[in-house]
Amino acid sequence: MKREAVLRVALIMSVIGLLYYLGYLLFFGYLPAPFLYDKRDTFMDFFNVSYWAYKDDRYLSWGAVYPALSFLVVKCFYWVTGVIPSGNSSMVMRDASAPVFYLYFMVFLISPLAWLYLERKEYGFSQMVAVYFISIISTPALFALERGNLIVLAPVFLALYLVRKDAWRAFSVAVLVNLKPYFILLFIPLVYRGNMRLFVISVYYSLALFVVSGTILDPYYWQVIPNLFSFGSSSDLFSIREVLSLPASLSAYKYVLGHPSVIGSQYYLLYGGWADLFGGVVGLMSLGGVVAALLALYLYKDYCGDDLMLVVLVVVITNLSYTTGGYSLILYFPLIAVFGRLRYARIYLLLLLFLVSPVDIIPLAHSYIGEQYSYLCGRTVGIDWTLGAGALIRPVLNYFLLLLVTVEVYKKNQLNQTFVEL
């Protein structure tokens, strides 16, 4: 009943957020915070990949950080719809590929049905309905949709990993790693538990998928590995407004404070010392939380079930880096039932409630940034950029979630020691 109550509140908040965003779009002609400030860029995570899926120098000139599988998945969208890719830029390609995005939208709507079917034993009908609609209209879900990001496929394979064993689990890891490389962390439970057979199978499937998809796509597919390292080390890859749109990790604050535009500002001349100190502390906190969680899993691996290990690793992934993106919070949706079975279930569910709620409707700051073409309304409009409360609240709450699941692992060990003493 506690879980059902939280799900109802989360659904109500998600509906409020959806209505607010739609009303704002109809009245002002663009989406407010937390959606990206560049209103021309709608759906461009998908169409940037689409454009470069049909270019031969994606890994060399563009520096693509997407494994080959992502480009092949996008090509499948074009193949299914029969759309012939055309255009000399990704935005022109978007304008000529409406049926492709309609298919993406259908996949966005169907994916939660797929993983809910896999987890059907975990929910009653009313809870399943609530979880489904939260999964498609909550703020992180709408953010993923507005970006057109392929992460919307990931919850299906996380659920498959959760409810299946052995070969199916190895297959799930292989697909996830080849969609989003940070899922390589899912190898950790296999290593910690000494399940070398399944570890070898998972690595084999992952490498086979990487090599086969890369061979089909591009002879330089291996270049994605150095591209990923350079991507993560860049200090000015994104603008401050992009990073603060829907951050999920404390590392976003460190990135902002170390951004060249901040370092060269009048603010930095006045408060640079304090900014450096705060950025360093935040960076250490972010890294320390991740290391503590992984260390706890290693030390107390014998007392953690597969479900708890998966939860900890997914929470680590969302806290790992600002580059993971705020849409990574949708990875929590297929884990709701697991969170509900843990020691601190009530706290977890409340944290998830706030993480998916439209707290960004509360403005912290705003500035007029001029006129832009808004893709969603098809005209040029004046943009009043707003920094929403979610930019401050979500990374902090997500970090607290990371600390709490780490404590959960420690408590598993402590409980086991109590039983031994008895």
What are these language model-derived features?
Residues M1-V163, A167-W168, R197-G325, C377-A391, ...:
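Primarily membrane-embedded glycan-assembly and transfer machineries that use lipid-linked glycans
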Residues W62-P67, A337-L422:
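Aromatic-enriched
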Residues L153, P181-I184, G326-I330:
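Transmembrane helix boundary and interhelical junction motifs in multipass membrane proteins
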Residues W168-L190, V312-L320:
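Membrane-interface alpha helices of multi-pass inner-membrane proteins
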Residues N178-P181, A208-L209, P358:
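Membrane-embedded alpha-helical segments of transport systems
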Residues R193-Y204, Y344-L350:
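Membrane-interfacial entry segments at the cytosolic side of transmembrane helices
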Residues G325-L342:
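Hydrophobic/aromatic-rich transmembrane helices and adjacent perimembrane loops
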